[in-house]
Swiss-Prot record:
One of the record's GO cellular component terms: ribonucleoprotein complex
Family matches, as PROSITE patterns: RIBOSOMAL_L31 (PS01143)
GO molecular function, one term: structural constituent of ribosome
Record keywords, A-Z: Ribonucleoprotein, Ribosomal protein
Organism: Borreliella burgdorferi (strain ATCC 35210 / DSM 4680 / CIP 102532 / B31)
UniProt GO BP: translation
Family designation: Belongs to the bacterial ribosomal protein bL31 family. Type B subfamily.
Lineage: Bacteria, Pseudomonadati, Spirochaetota, Spirochaetia, Spirochaetales
Protein name: Large ribosomal subunit protein bL31B
Amino acid sequence: MRKDIHPKNNLVVFKDGSNGAMFLTKSTLNSKETIKYIDGKEYPLVTVEITSKSHPFYTGQQKFVDAAGRIDKFNKRYKKS
């Protein structure tokens, strides 16, 4: 087997951009940003848009997206004459 062909796994903190929740896990991602985690150690920080702490499927809080205006516009445009 060849050595040094696989990416290196490091401990990385993923931070939810919408609510600030943080997760410490192993990842091959790296970042120049660092953050001091709960355990007092400093880790690379990767900010993500959405995680299980903010996604409606996992939180149980469904958000209604108002698509009525777009549907009406579509029906008006393609209405049979």
